[in-house]
Amino acid sequence: MSPTDASPVVTRFAPSPTGYLHIGGARTALFNWLYARGRGGKFLLRIEDTDKARSTAEATEAIFAGLRWLGLDWDGDAVSQAEGAARHAQVARALQEAGKAYKCFTTQDEIAAFREAARAEGRSTLFRSPWRDADPASHPDAPYVIRIKAPQEGTTVIADQVQGDVRIRNDQLDDMILLRSDGSPVYMLAVVVDDHDMGVTHVIRGDDHLNNAARQMMIYDAMGWDMPVFAHIPLIHGPDGKKLSKRHGALGVEEYQAMGYPAQAMRNYLARLGWSHGDDEFFGDAQAQAWFDLDGIGKSPARLDLKKLDNLSGQHLGVMADEAIVAGAQGYLAATGAPPLTEAQETGLSRAMYCLKDRAKKFPDLLEKAHFILASRPIDPDPKAAKSLDTVSRGILAELTPQLQNASWTRDTLEGVVGGLAEAHGLGLGKLAAPLRAALAGRSATPSVFDMMLVLGRDETLARLSDATSA
């Protein structure tokens, strides 16, 4: 059995808390979130923390923080897989009592010896337990594991929504362990029990789990449970087509936040990594949720392309509401450990936004362009800007100050006054703009000098010119 079209969609993201939220895991979470949200379903979060030696509370919090930054809200409380160990063991015992699983007393040393001999003789190393059909009366008083009785004939077909039908001969499946000799459940059992108990209808995960699906299907069949829809998505590779690694750049979601990408841009970019909707590249959440379907996921690995991410990031900054940009900038500063913007700086940034966001790719670009409004007097020019404030330039700026004193503070008037002064000295406007930028912003790359003057206002502009000419 499998979920019907009428079943409410329930997806899940189930990371192991052994490190940061990987960019590949973030995309898996996004695909699950989009699929559920676009169908009015639920997106659940399960922390697969059964490996106590490697699982940490810090990693769990990093996963939560990464998902929150990405804006991937989950329904209900996050589930701890480790807390369900008793339930997982209960299912294994039920299968044993139903004759669909059995106690195996073969030791690890015996299995190792079998496999070594099989390799030496060129035989299959697939272990077949002699205890599969043994009379319980013959069971020794010794440690045992519980194994499922795998089908030995026929074929298991994984009807995968991305990979297509994947066929695995059942004689290649082993009687996998469900309960270890210490009574603890194995990961493969825990995943299936949790997915069933959580009502998961669609398992969307990386294709590195594809081989697990056939073995997990055995448990669904043995328990008579509805089979979820499987969709195994290709992994993300680096620009060179090789498996993504540190040499390709950032791997953790928190690194992308610290680089200054807006979360909206990351969602857009990650959605396009392996999924497409025609030629659409730039879109928001509402469109992505409406468009996203499993049919649009390709089989080939997607390649990370930071230039494309930069372009999308710039497009999103260009259309974001000013207050959203200010909030995003504060988040970026927090992620890098920098001091937050003051209330006055937030106000100034909002006032200057119209001349900042069009050409910025990321938050650090925008904040650098906003230096003129975020900095306070006296402005300290950087080395490149300082070169334009020579004696001649300071003299011309000193002439400009009284001309601006009573000028109406409009773009046309300011352009006329500055342009007239440049012409009087036989200069092009650009020659006068350079020392003006240095005086007003302390930088050589800034928004238009007239935009800066309008944003700063008359008093602040004149004060900065006075500082520059009297230095």
UniProtKB/Swiss-Prot annotation:
GO terms for cellular component: cytosol. A motif ('HIGH' region) lies at residues 15-25. Coiled coil: none annotated. It is an enzyme of class 6 (ligase). Catalyzes the attachment of glutamate to tRNA(Glu) in a two-step reaction: glutamate is first activated by ATP to form Glu-AMP and then transferred to the acceptor end of tRNA(Glu). Belongs to the class-I aminoacyl-tRNA synthetase family. Glutamate--tRNA ligase type 1 subfamily. This is Glutamate--tRNA ligase 1. It comes from Dinoroseobacter shibae (strain DSM 16493 / NCIMB 14021 / DFL 12). The gene is gltX1.
